[in-house]
Amino acid sequence: MNLGIRHSVIPTVLDQTSRGDRAYDIFSLLLRERIVFLGQEVDDQIANLLVAEILYLEAEDPEKDIHLYINSPGGLGYAGMAIYDVMQHVRCEVSTICVGMGMSAAAMILAGGAAGKRFALPNAKIMIHEGSAGTRGAPRDMEIHLREVLATTRRMVDILAHHTGRSTEDVSRDIERDRYMTADEAKDYGLIDEIIMPRRGVSAAHLELAAAGSSVLK
């Protein structure tokens, strides 16, 4: 079960097997199809959950893709780095699909998907920006915290530059203020590779994602 989906009703789905019907929550059933979700703010709890799910799916089959659906406003930089790092660590490729929004740390995770397998739906919104230093306390502690925020921002700039093919100077300039992008703009920027169009007009990205093993899109 996706414990990160808080304060909501999680649907139950009946799956017919040779041993009879079995009830699953919807997220557990989709996990069997190698589909995982980032559907809330990025915090330690959701990061730990996604890391565990990705590692489990790698152990199940290191040759098959994992499909990570993203609808998140972002959140904690460290938690985002944890998800990003495990995506790069596992042997199987992680395809990323943005639905709704992928902002801040979630945009970094989106961009960190396997090359050629980073997607967004047509009305998705992506936003990149530098880290926030909102903190209180003794001046020296605030100075230490600010240095750490700047270091984390520099690392995020390096990651975005690596996955978009842009220079660190360009990325640093672009994130000085919140930069919102449409799916088309995110593709031009290099954060995603393709836009998944509606099913009635099946796109090459749709076919590629389906061929990669996502039965939900077939």
Mark where each language-model region is.
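N-terminal organellar transit peptides
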Residues: M1-A105, A111-K218
